[in-house]
Amino acid sequence: MGSIKVTVLGAGSWGTALSNLLAQKGVNTVLWGRDSAVIEEINRERENKRYLPGVKISQELIATADLEFALKDANFLVAAVPSQAFRDLLQKIKPYFKPEQILVNTAKGIEEGSLLRMSAVFTEVLPEYRDNYTILSGPSHAEEVGRGIPTAIVVSGYSPEKLYKVQELFSTEYFRVYTNDDLTGVELGGSLKNIIAIASGICTGLGLGDNTRAALVTRGLIEITRLGIKLGAKKETFMGLSGLGDLFVTAGSRHSRNYKAGILIGEGKSLEETQKEINMVVEGIRTTRAAYQLAQRLEVEMPITEALYKVLFAGLPPREGLFGLMTRAKKEELNF
């Protein structure tokens, strides 16, 4: 695949893991990042010690802080930045974007303020290239992908032809890519599971048991699906890799920043202390605010999201927020 060039934008853990996967596959791959110290370390030591320690980086991967150089002649652009930085990245690449390029987004979130999904943000910034947008989503910790551990994910977007191209690009013997045409469902599943992962971590931080976490995660999937259906998603998408799969891997894993953040909050740390200790972006924190506002606007019942919003932003004690869920009005289980 040497005739294809891929530029990965963002030298964090996920951008590093994906660019390394492609370089190992023989794809001409450039990794761009803003932090020149990280870029220099990757080129010098073949390791990203800050964001993906312990993973040896292919000698074929080129890392650079020069955006124009990185974008030159690229067939695929992989956006590996946090969701709240996605619009700014698009503005940066807009002057260089070409009609034949495919953008592969990996950010899982809802933009604060606008309450837009990443596909809608892309369409606002680059309206003439709407069909060039795709997203990779699913249960995929960068730490495990970097070590070659078998992983399965989903690609979604507007153009079936482009989905197949992305599927072919990323598929390896340990990285399996499925296509899914439900873009709304795939994006929402990946975004909203981070909220439930924080809440799951709070259960652990409070010293509660498996029963509590199982109930919370299962009911969390119900409210994620409820909002998705309201926005036009297919119910079955939330039973797949970008829904249940991503929720499963995020709501209880030592690799999950959102779960770890929840543990710290449950143990009594403030939001500011938690973010400082994690020292990387915790997508679910800002997604909680956006999802809460979206649910209020659409009149969708999301009790776990509402409780977490009050814990994070309105001073509600975590234990009080959790036990408040137990005393809500009685109802049927599968009430979408």
UniProtKB/Swiss-Prot annotation:
Sn-glycerol 3-phosphate binds at residues 108, 138, 140, 193, 246, 256-258. This is Glycerol-3-phosphate dehydrogenase [NAD(P)+]. Keywords: Cytoplasm, Lipid biosynthesis, Lipid metabolism, NAD, NADP, Nucleotide-binding, Oxidoreductase, Phospholipid biosynthesis, Phospholipid metabolism. Its EC number is 1.1.1.94. Its main location: cytoplasm. GO terms for molecular function: glycerol-3-phosphate dehydrogenase [NAD(P)+] activity; NAD binding. Catalyzes the reduction of the glycolytic intermediate dihydroxyacetone phosphate (DHAP) to sn-glycerol 3-phosphate (G3P), the key precursor for phospholipid synthesis. It is found in: Cytoplasm. NADPH binds at residues 13-14, 34, 108, 142, 257, 281, 283. It is an enzyme of class 1 (oxidoreductase). The keyword Kinase does not apply. It comes from Carboxydothermus hydrogenoformans (strain ATCC BAA-161 / DSM 6008 / Z-2901). Belongs to the NAD-dependent glycerol-3-phosphate dehydrogenase family. Pathway: Membrane lipid metabolism; glycerophospholipid metabolism. The active site is at 193 (proton acceptor). It catalyses: sn-glycerol 3-phosphate + NAD(+) = dihydroxyacetone phosphate + NADH + H(+); sn-glycerol 3-phosphate + NADP(+) = dihydroxyacetone phosphate + NADPH + H(+).
